[in-house]
């Protein structure tokens, strides 16, 4: 099956199934191109909550599809690649978080959306890299237990020094591949370029950046900047939209290792098979969903 056939069939099946295709900014270019909405975790969570379609095909990883099901329990939520997981989300379990909460009973628990439904269910509020700082600012507590990404926790702590941020020792394995040598090499090769990085990178990478933000923030910054060259310190998938938005600008990936294997598992044929066979449906136990719902609803209410 060639790509043109798959695209035509996906568009036909989308109408037949009354489906909406959501794709994360890290997805393959051809998958982004057939999606109804492409965005970061916050934008996609809001889209999942607001869509009127009966079926949501979530081109992303497991925790994203779970969040869509939590927010839209009456919808059929499909994930085209059932093996697309997230090591960061897997770095903390519900049981581990409950033990950590006992150590810090006065702390509010804020969990990054890159976490399981079970972890969200025992958290006070969720956040994304887009709104993590605002979520913490909105907290009435001066002590925050922030899970599971220690680098995002560190970034938030830098922005809000008057609050005590207690991080969990988890990290994104893709962003962790960036080294200071990568930064030195990229800046030597492209001295006129601005460096834009995701807050999931380590502190030593962030402190060398011109801008730190979520995938959508990075995309928008480059689009609106007067600069013509950019070094991009996040997953390679964002380059697709950046090049479409600003074909006259030059974009250089900070490291060739910035590829998330899990995000790249979803191919056009997987989206086609998902719609054709209504596979693989995502389920969240109702007792878990109800508890996690409050955490996610608070998240999407904060700009």
Swiss-Prot record:
Pathway: Cofactor biosynthesis; NAD(+) biosynthesis; quinolinate from iminoaspartate: step 1/1
Textual note on the cofactor: Binds 1 [4Fe-4S] cluster per subunit.
Binding site for iminosuccinate: 24, 41, 112-114, 129, 198-200, 215
Domain of life from the UniProt record: Bacteria
Predominant location: cytoplasm
Biological processes annotated in GO: 'de novo' NAD biosynthetic process from L-aspartate
Essential cofactor(s): [4Fe-4S] cluster
Compartments where found: Cytoplasm
Keyword field: 4Fe-4S, Cytoplasm, Iron, Iron-sulfur, Metal-binding, Pyridine nucleotide biosynthesis, Transferase
EC number: 2.5.1.72
Catalysed reactions, as listed in the record: iminosuccinate + dihydroxyacetone phosphate = quinolinate + phosphate + 2 H2O + H(+)
Keyword Nucleotide-binding applies: no
Single Gene Ontology MF annotation: metal ion binding
InterPro entries (UniProt xref): NadA (IPR003473), NadA_sf (IPR036094), Quinolinate_synth_type2 (IPR023066)
Gene Ontology cellular-component annotations: cytoplasm
Residue positions binding [4Fe-4S] cluster: 86, 172, 260
Matches recorded under PANTHER family: QUINOLINATE SYNTHASE, CHLOROPLASTIC, QUINOLINATE SYNTHETASE A
Biological function: Catalyzes the condensation of iminoaspartate with dihydroxyacetone phosphate to form quinolinate.
Family: Belongs to the quinolinate synthase family. Type 2 subfamily.
Family annotation (HAMAP family): NadA_type2
Protein name in UniProt: Quinolinate synthase
Organism: Clostridium kluyveri (strain ATCC 8527 / DSM 555 / NBRC 12016 / NCIMB 10680 / K1)
Lineage: Bacteria, Bacillati, Bacillota, Clostridia, Eubacteriales
């Amino acid at each position: 099956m060639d790509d043109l056939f798959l695209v035509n069939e996906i568009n036909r099946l989308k109408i037949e199934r009354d489906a909406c295709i959501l794709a994360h900014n890290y997805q393959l270019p051809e998958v982004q191109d057939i999606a109804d909405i492409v965005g970061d975790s916050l934008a996609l969570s809001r889209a999942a909550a607001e869509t009127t379609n009966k079926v949501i095909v979530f081109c992303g990883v497991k925790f994203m599809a779970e969040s869509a099901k939590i927010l839209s329990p009456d919808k059929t939520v499909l994930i085209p690649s059932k093996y697309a997981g997230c090591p960061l989300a897997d770095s903390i379990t519900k049981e581990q978080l409950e033990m950590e909460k006992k150590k810090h009973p006065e702390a509010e628990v804020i969990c990054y959306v890159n976490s399981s439904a079970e972890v969200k269910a025992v958290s006070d509020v969720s956040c994304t890299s887009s709104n993590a700082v605002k979520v913490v600012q909105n907290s009435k507590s001066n002590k925050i237990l922030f899970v599971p990404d220690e680098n995002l926790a560190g970034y938030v702590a830098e922005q809000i020094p008057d609050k005590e941020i207690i991080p969990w020792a988890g990290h994104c394995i893709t962003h962790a591949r960036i080294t200071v040598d990568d930064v030195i090499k990229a800046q030597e090769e492209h001295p006129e370029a601005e460096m834009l990085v995701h807050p999931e990178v380590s502190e030593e990478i962030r402190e060398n950046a011109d801008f730190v933000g979520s995938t959508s923030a990075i995309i928008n910054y480059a689009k609106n900047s007067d600069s013509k060259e950019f070094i991009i310190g996040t997953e390679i998938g964002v380059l697709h939209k950046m090049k479409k938005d600003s074909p006259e600008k030059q974009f250089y990936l900070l490291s060739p290792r910035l590829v998330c294997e899990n995000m790249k598992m979803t191919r056009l044929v997987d989206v086609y098979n998902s719609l054709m066979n209504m596979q693989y449906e995502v389920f969240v136990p109702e007792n878990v969903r109800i508890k996690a719902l409050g955490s996610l609803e608070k998240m999407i209410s904060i700009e």
